[in-house]
Amino acid sequence: MYRSFGKRLFDLLVCLPIVLAVSPVLLLAAALVKLESRGPVFFVQERLGRYGRTFLTYKFRTMTHRKREATAEILPGHSEVTRSGHWLRRFKIDEFPQLLNILNGDMSLVGPRPALPDHINEYNEDGLKRLLERPGMTGLSQVSGNIYLSWPDRWFYDAQYVKRLSLLKDATIIIKTVAVVLLGEERFLKKPHADPEQTSETEAANSGPHDHRHAA
């Protein structure tokens, strides 16, 4: 019931008040991006959605405006991240425009993070399972270490989320996300304990795609 109908209703009931509450923050962030560097306010990129359908995600631009490889790895302290971009990334404010993706049904508040289309070629069985639900602004892997996890570990968490999806699980992840934003992802690093039959597959797939926290 929750998976087929309640989750979408939950997204709308929670997302609409959030959009109204953070509107001043969105306007301030847009102004900072525009004033600090030349280029568009938003970074727009094609990502994988439910059942492998592609859609456009929106984020506040946090880097200097120039062409770069789509899979270039961008870590904290990167020289091309702007001053305002550093703070937008630190407190995840750069992700706020994805609230619009949630309202139009491309994303959910909670779910596997939307991946680049090219990454589907790297997926193991867990990676493919993450495509069974709408991608989320936050998810189980994001509150379990995120960039400090290997790709197979992230996919494992995503697959576990899809398997055990519930209202309580979504509410718990949202609450944990607040703690992660305030305290940092590294403090919440938690290595998954895979089922024995999954171990060999996970080890074989341990060289997943590069991290895609880039050009945002």
What name fits each language-model region?
Residues 1-65, 172-216:
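A hydrophobic, helix-centered structural microdomain
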Residues 43-80, 138-156:
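Short, glycine-rich, amphipathic interfacial segments at transmembrane boundaries or analogous
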Residues 29, 44, 72, 110-112, ...:
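Short, hydrophobic secondary-structure boundary micro-motifs
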Residues 15, 30, 43, 82-86, ...:
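Positions in alpha-helical segments
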Residues 34-35, 90, 102, 146:
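Conserved catalytic core of Hanks-type protein kinase domains
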Residues 4, 52, 83, 98, ...:
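Amphipathic alpha-helical recognition patches that constitute DNA-binding helices
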Residues 1-15, 44-45, 140-142, 146-167, ...:
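Glycine-rich flexible loop motifs, especially short His-Gly-Gly/GGXG/HXGH segments used as catalytic or interaction
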Residues 76-134, 174-177:
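A short, structured surface patch at a secondary-structure boundary
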